[in-house]
Every structure is written in structure tokens, then in C-alpha cells.
UniProtKB/Swiss-Prot annotation:
Belongs to the RecO family. This is DNA repair protein RecO. Transmembrane segments: none annotated. Involved in DNA repair and RecF pathway recombination. It comes from the Bacteria. One of its GO terms (biological process) is DNA recombination. Keywords: DNA damage, DNA recombination, DNA repair.
């Protein structure tokens, strides 16, 4: 059956001489893979809308069997987000986000994730200064999607929400109040404490407007990268490369 949908290309690879298989995250079906016949031919009109990170309209022949690939009929490029490809750091941020979404099961719709993904890639492309912040917030947001959410807004040792948070532990992956502070915890200032509280109380868009210094953002970046590696069990090449760029006092 024919369907029309919008989506962002998460992955694309050659299949046979003139064909590709792409995976997109769509408004109608969530993650879905498509076989794109003939798109590697010079005269193909579909080749522009199926590149990595392309946001496009797709007309597809939807497979009735979930074990068979759906087929692309036509693609129409809406936005290539091409500025991302010109900057190594921006590419890392976008690739971390898309690799997380790519890890999800096929055809489980989550429209809020679709909107957040599209917004995140758009901001990274158009407002490069927000790129790392968007990436980190998305990584925290994605923990909710996979059911692995942590709560740093309370002390992870005594569970108090009354005592102010003064540090975060990279060993126990939790926050610490002044009564539970250990030497292996990293002391944080009020700005980072407030930003962390905002992550767990407010939505993605609200958190984008919260102030955070470069050093504090780097602390949070290192924390969430380590959490994905040690607790979630996900650590992509882009995550590793980003970790090599992060420094904090």
C-alpha cells in the first residue's frame, strides 16, 4: 500500500549496483528501512532526498510484512542540513543523536521523539554554538525512551530532595548532597546544579534556554558519555571521539 510520510535519514548504504537501503525516522512509523531502487543512477531524481541527515518527504510502498523491506517510490528533499557536514564537531553531535535513534526497534512510533530529533538536528545545523548542549540534552532525553532514566535532581546516596546537591559521582552515577559527599565526587556550582534540576523537571525546549557555562557543560558531557558506556552499554565511535575533545577544570 502507498503511504506518504516525512522523515530524517539515519543511515544509508549501497545495495547492489544502483540501489541503496536507507533507514529513516518518520512521523508515521518511527524507524523504518526502505530499499531505494535505481537511486545510484546518474539521472535518478530520488538521490537528493536520501542522503544521511536529509529531511525529506517520502512516498513509499509499505510492506504488509514487517520482515520485508518497504520500497521507496519518490523522495522530495525538504532540508539537507548541509552545514553539519562542514564542521567536524557538529557532525559528531548529529551522529551521536542519530546513532542512538538508529538503535531502536523498527516501526514503533514515537511522535515526540520524531519532533525532538528534527528540532535537534535543525538547531545543530543553524545554531552551531548550541550544538554540544543539544547533543547532551538529547542523550539525557533518550534515556527516557529506552527506560534507563536517571534522576540527578536528588542525592543518590540518601535520596534526599531537600539537601542541596553539591557534587556528582562518576563512580556511582548519581548526585551527592553535602552530607554524603565523597572524595571521588566532583564538586559542582549552583549553575550546574540548577541546570541538572531543570533537565529532570522541564521539557527539552525549556532546557535549551537554560544558561550553562562551557566548563559546566563539559562536566555534564563527560558524565553522560561515561554513563552510556558503563551503564547503558552503548558507546559509538562518535561518542569516543567527542570524549577526546572534552576538558574541564
Amino acid at each position: 500500500m502507498e503511504k506518504t510520510l516525512k522523515g530524517i535519514v539515519l543511515n544509508s548504504f549501497d545495495f547492489q549496483d544502483y540501489d541503496k537501503i536507507i533507514t529513516i525516522y518518520s512521523n508515521l512509523y518511527g524507524k523504518i528501512s526502505l530499499v531505494c531502487l535505481g537511486v545510484n543512477k546518474i539521472k535518478s531524481k530520488n538521490k537528493y532526498g536520501i542522503n544521511y541527515l536529509s529531511y525529506s518527504n517520502f512516498e513509499i510502498f509499505k510492506s504488509k510484512n514487517k520482515f520485508n523491506l518497504s520500497k521507496l517510490k519518490r523522495s522530495e528533499l525538504i532540508n539537507s542540513f548541509n552545514h553539519i557536514s562542514t564542521d567536524f564537531n557538529l557532525y559528531l553531535y548529529a551522529n551521536i543523536i542519530t546513532s542512538l535513534v538508529l538503535s531502536l526497534d523498527e516501526q514503533i512510533k514515537n511522535y515526540n521523539l520524531y519532533k525532538t530529533l528534527k528540532l535537534s538536528i535543525s538547531i545543530i545545523n543553524n545554531k552551531s554554538d548550541f550544538g554540544l548542549k543539544v547533543c547532551v540534552l538529547f542523550m539525557f532525553y533518550f534515556l527516557k525512551i529506552i527506560g534507563n532514566q536517571i534522576d540527578l535532581s536528588k542525592c543518590g546516596f540518601c535520596n534526599s530532595k531537600i539537601n542541596p546537591i553539591i557534587a556528582i559521582s562518576f563512580t556511582n552515577y548519581c548526585s551527592s548532597c553535602k552530607f554524603c559527599y565523597f572524595d571521588d565526587c566532583i564538586l559542582i556550582d549552583n549553575q550546574l546544579s540548577n541546570f541538572i534540576n531543570s533537565i529532570f523537571k522541564n521539557d527539552f525546549i525549556t532546557n535549551l534556554s537554560q544558561e550553562i557555562s562551557t566548563n559546566n557543560l563539559n562536566i555534564l558531557t563527560r558524565f553522560i558519555l561515561n554513563y552510556y558506556q558503563d551503564i547503558v552499554g552503548t558507546y559509538t565511535t562518535s561518542m569516543y571521539l567527542l570524549s577526546t575533545l572534552i576538558r574541564f577544570n
